[in-house]
Amino acid sequence: MFVLISTLLSIAILAGIYHLSSKREQQHARKYQLLTLLRDVVHLLRHHRAATHYSLQFQQNDQQKLDALNDALTNKLHLLVETSRFENKPMYRVLQIKVGKLLEQWDDHSVARNQMEHGKLIRHCLFLMDEVTIAWLAVEQRDDLHNEYHMNWQNIMDSLETLTQLRISIQDLEEQGGNERFKNYASVMMRKLNQLAVIAPLSITSPASTRSIQTLNEYVTGSHVDLTEAELYGVTSDLSLTIFNTYDHVLSDVVESLYLPLPRLSLAG
């Protein structure tokens, strides 16, 4: 009788451990998938911004590319809503609605507003990614990772805010004081990039990043001031990629420490 009770008790304990382990694995898998999907949405939005910017700037549509990006974004956002927990679905639906509105209305925007609207949605996604990551770190009680991640996150968001101001100032270059305003934001941007270099040196030393930093430096020092508006937007696009790659580096380190390495992004660039 004692042996039977001991056996049943052991089975119950093992079943409980298995249940908890299975539940924890499901929680890990859901957070991992949410971050992966949000990361893909950011990447696709960046590509959509570049494609629509080209269309608005030069009045030429690459309709096949735009259709492919629309389909990919629509699919990713649907998966995002489906993957999220019931109580979190509304905030992902808000993102889905906002992106859908942009996909329908971007061709009514000016070049500057198109840049700003895409930037808002990209930051929206990054804040959602931050929320998932912070919650994951809290559940796992990884205070060591949390503190480092939070510090890096602040530097990255400060850099994004500076980049937004730099982008906005491009449209005002021909106005009184516009050139000095752009130079001021360019100087601040270079300082922010130096801070990011401590976080992810490889992101800052990429060819596109190095070229853009050099161009900004030449503009600030006055040795290269004959850049067109299109060229300046190109510089800010390269810097946007640099900042995104820096955050991707930070996020990848955290997620790999908690669960698994993040997959390679499906689109290059």
Predicted regions span which residues?
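Hydrophobic alpha-helical segments
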Residues: 1-269
